[in-house]
Amino acid sequence: MKMKIMDVNLNYQRYGNIKGKTIVLLHGWGQNIDMMKPIGDRFTKDFDIVIFDLPGFGNSSEPKKVFSCYDYVELIHQALEELKVEKPIIIGHSFGGKLGLLYASIYETEKLVCLASPFCKEIQKVTMKAKLLKTLKKVPLLNKLEDFAKRHMGSTDYRNASGVMRNILVGHVNLDIKEDIKKIKCPTLLIWGTNDEAVSIERAYELEKLIKDAGLVVYEGCTHYAYLERLGQTISVLKSFLG
């Protein structure tokens, strides 16, 4: 399904229990809807599921101007208004988690889940594609996503981004949102891997301290894609947190 928001053709999926509370799933940079469906598909009985292809990814068009992270958040908010969603539960991975943090600092949010989410500048040691492909190969249930990753992720995020998306990426990487995070009031769950080389585990402990009502779950030996590497455990933790 598609809608036009802020001059972007926004692709999304909505499924599950329309009478339940809404879970909004936000993927990371260079990814798309498919990377969050392993979570969404397991909550269809009790929750209304909304997954977006963020602007510039998947089947959503690129922004016609350079979007800031705040622009992405405003677009998400307008899209949810169009879908008549109020006070969503937001689950975001990496870049999507950063947008979730900003969303919850501005708009009323039921609960927030951040999966390895950056919030200040971090020096990356290895490419996101290399880590993702390694993770997908190790997890049997996620093998089908390996081809997707090969198609949709370049050797580096920056090199493969178009002019507009490249400038958006630079803005995202350099944006420090610590002061915004201090405004978050909703219950927040953080899930991190100890071997995350994109957003270090030290950042997870720092983020936990910045949010008034936050809890941290750490997966020993897992990477930036810890939520997929321990998918069963992730689902169990989420069920407990979401109630």
Where in this protein do the model-derived segments appear?
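Catalytic histidine-centered segment of alpha/beta-hydrolase-like enzymes
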Residues: 222-231
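Conserved alpha/beta-hydrolase catalytic His-Asp/Glu region
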Residues: 123-186
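Flexible "cap/lid" loop of the alpha/beta hydrolase fold
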Residues: 98-140
